[in-house]
């Protein structure tokens, strides 16, 4: 698709139409939604930790538990507000800790469980029982279990949410094609944590988050706001720092990118879907200004439904002008700019980034659905080596 066929005016007209609507809709989150408060945060963190210490853990419910932990960090009131602001009709279920009795091998045992509508007491107890087996094995191996290997280490919940941060912007693909990239990145950035916990299996945890976000789209809104709040909070643990880096890179710079309002998906990394044959910086400035008008998360929620309208502005994030606009500029290598840029700083940032991409030679063209002419033009412009171009 040549860029000349994508008219910015088309997007502006749609924006005017949408802005003129006098009505709103209410979406349903289902019968009840669990909204844990700060007081159960420690228990949810421990539940995450139990999954992490369990060898060959079943991660079917890990995504859900991770999201409940994220909500407990936001707090009940803010979680409900986020959902209502996103147009959801919320029937909130308060979450408390209660005692649950279960017969195990003829002996009645007591367990502390949460009053969750989304996760039965039996499932919570089973998670604890399985984790105890692994903990006993760990005791035999280590003699004494160091704090960072225990299920109640304070960073357990955030370790799991690091994988959610990798999954979140892959959702625009509409399938799980980004799973391989998520696993590779998780294995790299969480390598120390993987050494600590045998149950930290990126593939299984990522699939669990995919499942949760696909079945409960309202949790996407919650997670995005949680990610922004968490990343903007100073201090915190090493894992919180990793989370902020992953979230801001994935959401701020984008593994789902601008291509003049047409969606381009990442197969490799942020240096990808920006091979545009007819890019001109005048259009980049227009796109940038329009994106500023739309605001922080504009477009993110609508990518699946309306790619052209989703400029994925992300102007609140520090990497926006240097990264996203470099991408939107078609690398600034695909076409020459004729005339004086209206925004010299913007032009320089995009140009510098484009040159860096060209020099590194790691652009992936396979995701762009290019015509034969466009592909030929790219080859002519970049003179890439055969291995640098994925077709």
Swiss-Prot record:
UniProt KW keywords: Capsid protein, Helical capsid protein, Host cytoplasm, Host-virus interaction, Inhibition of host innate immune response by virus, Inhibition of host interferon signaling pathway by virus, Inhibition of host MAVS by virus, Inhibition of host MDA5 by virus, Inhibition of host NF-kappa-B by virus, Inhibition of host PKR by virus, Inhibition of host RLR pathway by virus, Interferon antiviral system evasion, Phosphoprotein, Ribonucleoprotein, RNA-binding, Viral immunoevasion, Viral nucleoprotein, Virion
Subcellular localization, as worded in the UniProt entry: Virion; Host cytoplasm
Region feature Interaction with the phosphoprotein, mapped onto this chain: 31-252, 244-290, 338-364
Residues the record lists as Phosphotyrosine modifications: 38
Presence of the UniProt keyword Phosphoprotein in the record: yes
Record's comment on post-translational modification: Tyrosine phosphorylation modulates viral transcription and replication.
Pfam families, per the entry: Pneumo_ncap (PF03246)
Superkingdom of the organism of origin: Viruses
GO molecular function: protein serine/threonine kinase inhibitor activity; RNA binding
GO CC terms in record: helical viral capsid; host cell cytoplasm; ribonucleoprotein complex; viral nucleocapsid
GO biological process per UniProt: symbiont-mediated suppression of host cytoplasmic pattern recognition receptor signaling pathway via inhibition of MAVS activity; symbiont-mediated suppression of host cytoplasmic pattern recognition receptor signaling pathway via inhibition of MDA-5 activity; symbiont-mediated suppression of host NF-kappaB cascade; symbiont-mediated suppression of host PKR/eIFalpha signaling; symbiont-mediated suppression of host type I interferon-mediated signaling pathway
Assembly behavior: Homomultimerizes to form the nucleocapsid. Binds to viral genomic RNA. Interacts (via N-terminus) with the phosphoprotein P (via C-terminus); the phosphorylated phosphoprotein P binds to N-RNA complex. When in a monomeric RNA-free form, interacts with the phosphoprotein (via N-terminus). Interacts with protein M2-1; this interaction allows the association of nucleocapsid with the matrix protein. Interacts with host EIF2AK2/PKR; this interaction inhibits EIF2AK2 phosphorylation of EIF2S1 and blocks EIF2AK2-mediated translation shutoff.
Protein family (similarity comment): Belongs to the paramyxoviruses nucleocapsid family.
Purpose: Encapsidates the viral RNA genome by forming a left-handed helical nucleocapsid that protects the RNA from nucleases. RNA replication depends on the availability of soluble nucleoprotein. The encapsidated genomic RNA is termed the NC and serves as template for transcription and replication. Together with the phosphoprotein, sequesters host NF-kappa-B in inclusion bodies (IBs) thereby inhibiting this host defense pathway. May also act as a modulator of the innate immune response by sequestration of host IFIH1/MDA5 and MAVS into IBs.
Name of protein: Nucleoprotein
